[in-house]
Amino acid sequence: MERIIFLALLCLSLNKQANAQNLQTNYKTKYVYILVIDGPRYSETYGEPTCKYSPILCDSLKHEGTFYANFKNNGPTYTVPGHTAIVTGTYQRISNAGTALPKEPNIFQYFLKATGKDSTAAYVVASKGKLDVLVNTSHKKWNNQFVASTYCGPNGNGLGYGRDDKTFAKTTELLQSANPPQLMLINLLAVDVYGHANNWDKYLESITQTDLYAAKLWQMIQENPALRNQTTLFITNDHGRHLDGVRSGFVNHGCRCEGCRHISLLVLGPDTPKGVVVTEESEMTDISKTIADILHFEMPTSKGELLRTAFPLK
């Protein structure tokens, strides 16, 4: 009798393992990239009726994927906290100067631990040097463990602000290498910098330039046989900017007004339906949970939820 019970339990366990493996084979995605366009207001991007500042993202690319029209930053609306929410799946008040590490582990650490890959399999490439804090955590069980590679700032050393064209050149170099990163976040800063400089014309020009960068990034993915039909691209923001009439308007951000909280998300990839617009609210913490699901690693510290419309296999 005990033998029969043992065999029954063994069969049940094997069936569960087989089902889990079958679920894992469903996703075509093997590479995941996140492009963060730093600090545009929704009213100048997808919310602009004629799409004149982002003609590619708002039109042709939007039709190639699933667009979240009511995507939010529901935490502190600053650069480091916003990026931290994306990669950890948690909101926290953290220094925006890059002088403190996030409190929770991130997608890169969970991914590297789960896969056993070396640090170059996961990357943060950022125009803002302070974003090199994204790959580490102050969590005592994870601090300095499974730390991804970084190239942040003008010389990749985590100091200062670099030019977006240099950041994109580094991104291009990595994508065209023999072994592209499997998981990567890219930050482009110009929109945010010119907003803070109160330079409206340059702010708008930078939105258009990042539109071109986004299109070029997707094009490079499609032209690379290793990445084509195996890569999901998330295009999003870390925060918006004050609405007109709120404090200093587009010049700054950091409050909980709709302008600061309303950001965008466009998901492109082989597992994602085309031409779908999601109007229900989702938030930036959902990105981490979704990436964990499609790349098959556990991320228990993330507070996000799976973006099911973009990945309807589950």
Please provide the spans of the model-predicted regions.
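Bacterial Sec-dependent N-terminal signal peptides
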Residues: 1-25
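Active-site-proximal N-terminal segment of extracellular/periplasmic enzymes that hydrolyze or transfer
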Residues: 21-65
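Structural recognition of the beta-strand scaffold that forms the well-ordered cores
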Residues: 32-36, 43, 67-71, 85-87, ...
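Metal-dependent active-site segment of extracytoplasmic phospho-/sulfohydrolases and closely related
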Residues: 33-34, 211-251, 291
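Active-site segment of extracytoplasmic enzymes that catalyze sulfate/phosphate-ester chemistry
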Residues: 59-102
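Substrate-binding rim/cap in mid-to-C-terminal beta-strand-loop elements of soluble/periplasmic
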Residues: 81-88, 252-295, 313
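Catalytic-site neighborhoods of secreted/periplasmic enzymes
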Residues: 93-159
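Active-site His/acidic residue clusters
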Residues: 135-154, 169-212, 216
